[in-house]
């Protein structure tokens, strides 16, 4: 679990009422992939965006990166609205870098390590000492001495080394924020801890911020300052990592935690699959799979009808513990943003 204090309380990156929708084929309903999200990331902060496959977290990350323009809402960086066109977007992408989950797919097999890391410098017209910048980035990523790796090709490296090359390619541009999409999912268990430790060290040494997209709450515990749990296009619970993972309020968060190896009690088996984002249920979007509603607990708390029919407002993007859940509100959970 990350414990480094934040450098600043002013957000570096903010999403406000962000929505991303994709039109359906042949007149089908629009898919609401991101359906109203507020999210702040502060300088030096690591935020884990957690949820099942298909919940919208990768689409949200791509929109924050400037790769997918929002349907509505806005993204700001350093207080300025993100311009999704032209030179402004190119300059933004230098400051915000992406690290993908599959290093083999991220690296051109015909390019040497040196060329892979130097590519960003060349795209952005770097006028300094290219060799020195590449060497420094490889060293920071844990590939030392860097000169030993210059002429190697991706197939000559281990999985962990390839991921370090990808990270070096992001670091070489001296970004302020890294978006890491499942950064250790394709790696052996023995290597995952090394890459997570590297990301934490880079935050401590460089003041980097990071958004880590993952389905694994265990990973979030090891690396994040704050967690945002996403379900069907919305963040349904957010807060400091220790508070959220030791005292989760939302039934969905509880279900995700219940399947971790160290969890006590029986795992929660959710009914069915996540609904189609083109057919978002009325009321709480989780209610059709909710174990609390199915067990009768919501009925006993007097909120079952609200669960089925009353939508919940978007949680604000700040760092306080918040949950969008009628049942949690009835039980006294931290839901001020969900009742405004």
Show where each model-derived region lies:
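ABC transporter nucleotide-binding domains
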Residues: 1-246, 329-340
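Short catalytic/signature loops enriched in Gly
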Residues: 25, 30, 238-340
């Amino acid at each position: 679990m990350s414990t480094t204090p934040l450098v600043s309380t002013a957000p570096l990156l903010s999403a406000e009422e962000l929505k991303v929708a994709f039109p359906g084929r042949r007149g089908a309903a629009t898919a609401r992939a991101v359906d109203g999200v507020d999210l702040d990331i502060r300088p030096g902060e690591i935020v884990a965006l957690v949820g099942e496959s298909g919940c919208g977290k990768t689409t949200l990350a791509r929109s924050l990166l400037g790769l997918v323009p929002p349907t509505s809402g806005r993204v700001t960086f350093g207080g300025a609205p993100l311009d999704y066109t032209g030179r402004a977007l190119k300059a933004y992408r230098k400051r915000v870098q992406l690290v993908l989950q599959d290093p083999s797919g991220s690296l051109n097999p015909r390019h040497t390590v040196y060329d892979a890391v130097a590519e960003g410098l060349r795209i952005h017209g770097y006028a300094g000492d290219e060799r020195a910048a590449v060497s420094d980035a490889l060293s920071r990523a844990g590939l030392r001495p860097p000169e030993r790796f210059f002429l190697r090709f991706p197939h000559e490296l281990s999985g962990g080394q390839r991921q370090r090359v990808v990270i070096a390619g992001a670091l070489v541009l001296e970004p302020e924020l890294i978006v890491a999409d499942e950064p250790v999912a394709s790696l052996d268990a023995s290597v995952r801890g090394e890459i997570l430790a590297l990301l934490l060290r880079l935050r401590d040494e460089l003041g980097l911020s990071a958004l880590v997209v993952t389905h694994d709450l265990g990973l979030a515990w090891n690396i994040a300052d704050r967690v945002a749990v996403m379900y069907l296009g919305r963040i349904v619970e957010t807060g400091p990592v220790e508070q959220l993972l030791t005292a989760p309020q939302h039934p969905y968060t509880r279900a995700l935690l219940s399947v971790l190896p160290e969890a006590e009690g029986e795992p929660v088996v959710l009914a069915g699959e996540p609904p189609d984002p083109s057919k978002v249920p009325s009321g709480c979007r989780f209610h059709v799979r909710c174990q609390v509603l199915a067990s009768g607990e919501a009925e006993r708390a007097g909120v079952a009808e609200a669960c089925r029919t009353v939508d919940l407002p978007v949680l604000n993007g700040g760092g306080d513990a918040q949950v969008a859940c009628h049942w949690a509100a009835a039980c006294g959970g931290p839901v001020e943003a969900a009742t405004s």
